[in-house]
């Protein structure tokens, strides 16, 4: 065989192939595996086994006595960072006779711009729209020159104009004229939007209080998510939610919550039958509702702090628009059931309707009377004026007789006028005090629902007694007429306050009774 010559590259290739020979992988099993079958499934379902030990025994931390007895040092400055000299009070006293520095006086001077007289200076702020600036990016200041109107001046002028445009009702006459203006404005035809001149009305409908439904107190319930049932959708879900009920419940631990009940299939059929027949309910039928959700609640009503009035509108075809009041606002949030606490998922609400009893009917009538407020105020004012004038005439006769019989019948008119002025001041003060007491009592009645009207009656009696004293002290016929005018004013103001407070007390007590009673349904 002829000799061959190998190059250095061939020698390296042969050496590299011999050095990187693959080693066969060994199996992890000593013996040879014959079968490769997988394990069978567990013949029964997995189960939860109760853990008999306390779950917190490995993680619960208890402080030792050394940690409890140790006192941590609070390293702070002795003056807490506030350097105040409490010993010498003259340290921070300012001398009123001190002279300011010349540089500081410049800061206190007002900037007064002298009127520019030269024609050249007047051309500086002139805007020439057809001229192009050489810089593409420029501010408003650079584009339109120096502006003499400062933003501070603009803000001050706008605030002043706002105050002049707004009607600030400071006195009684301006308030009365503003109230009367609202009635006149309501009679005017609406031709355009109040803030958008191009928007015109499509249809104009009158708005009235809902006398039909005002007797029933309404509440606004706000859910944090859609309470619709999961197994229903569309019109079926809306029909079920329209017949839903909420009731307060309590779990085994004594925690209160709100349960949301939905009607069953049998109840839905009964409610549809009642609607077709035009009935509110069937007296002998029983309606079943099953619990669907559990909520925590937050309630706000008229007695709550920060309460805001809320109304809703009802559009009735061919009749108009009616508004009603939402006295209560309820916010519902989903309730988290604690571990180990049995929830009321199987709770069933059984409802059987009945007729309303006397207290509920009285509460409805009180709400209707509160809305109508049909007190004949003018007739009452006339009757009160007549009574006061008759009593004042009798008192004037008694006073004139006493003056004829008495030895001091020739007193000066100035003294009687002075006494009359003092008595008028006393009457005004007592009227103010009685009005403040009435207002405080009315607020208290709205919150606590009391039915006491003795304060207003006492104020009326005080007004009549004071008027009697005026009649006895006055001597001349003119003073008697003045006393009659004062007495008629005080007497005409106080009885209406008592009647109004009495009416509000009846309304409040009736509303409290209505809220405490059920809405015409017994739930088991």
Swiss-Prot record:
Family: Belongs to the PAF1 family.
Region feature Disordered, mapped onto this chain: 1-23, 359-524
Gene: paf1
Biased composition (Low complexity): 490-500, 510-524
Coiled-coil regions listed in the entry: 351-384, 412-442
Subcellular localization(s) per the UniProt record: Nucleus
Assembly notes: Component of the PAF1 complex, which at least consists of cdc73, paf1, leo1, ctr9 and rtf1. The PAF1 complex interacts with PHF5A.
GO molecular function: chromatin binding; RNA polymerase II complex binding
Organism, as annotated: Xenopus laevis
GO biological process, alphabetically ordered: negative regulation of transcription by RNA polymerase II; transcription elongation by RNA polymerase II
A cellular component annotation (GO) from this entry: Cdc73/Paf1 complex
Acidic residues bias (residue ranges): 375-384, 420-436, 448-461, 468-481
The protein's name in its UniProt record: RNA polymerase II-associated factor 1 homolog
Domain of life of the native organism: Eukaryota
Biased amino acid composition, Basic and acidic residues: 359-374, 396-407, 437-447
This protein's UniProt keywords: Coiled coil, Nucleus, Transcription, Transcription regulation
Chain's role: Component of the PAF1 complex (PAF1C) which has multiple functions during transcription by RNA polymerase II. PAF1C associates with RNA polymerase II, is involved in transcriptional elongation and in histone modifications including methylation on histone H3 'Lys-4' (H3K4me3).
Main location: nucleus
